[in-house]
Amino acid sequence: MTTADNARILRAEEVTGLVAEIPEGHRHLRTTLTLADGTSLTLQESTIAAIVRAYTAVKTSPVTTRVVMRGRRMAERKPGYAEWQLLEE
């Protein structure tokens, strides 16, 4: 794993496995990355959705090269949505 200014960058070869599933008794997707050093990182559906939105915005736009999202607590939200959301600035 490389670092730059306190940021961790995972190289593709450092991710040895990925499991995306809706655990028993839950309603939302969880995605677990397994790393070469044996550690794992589990992301909730709302985090993956934010990553997908940002990725899609950058990859499909001829002019957008960056998307910035910040976490916010949402007092009003759709049923089933998390109170904490990553939203575009």
Listing of model-derived features with the role each one plays in the protein:
Residues H28-R30, T64, Y81:
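Broad gene-expression machinery/nucleic-acid interaction feature
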Residues A12-E21:
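Phosphoinositide-dependent membrane-docking surfaces
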Residues R70-E89:
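Polar/charged, Gly/Pro-rich intrinsically disordered segments
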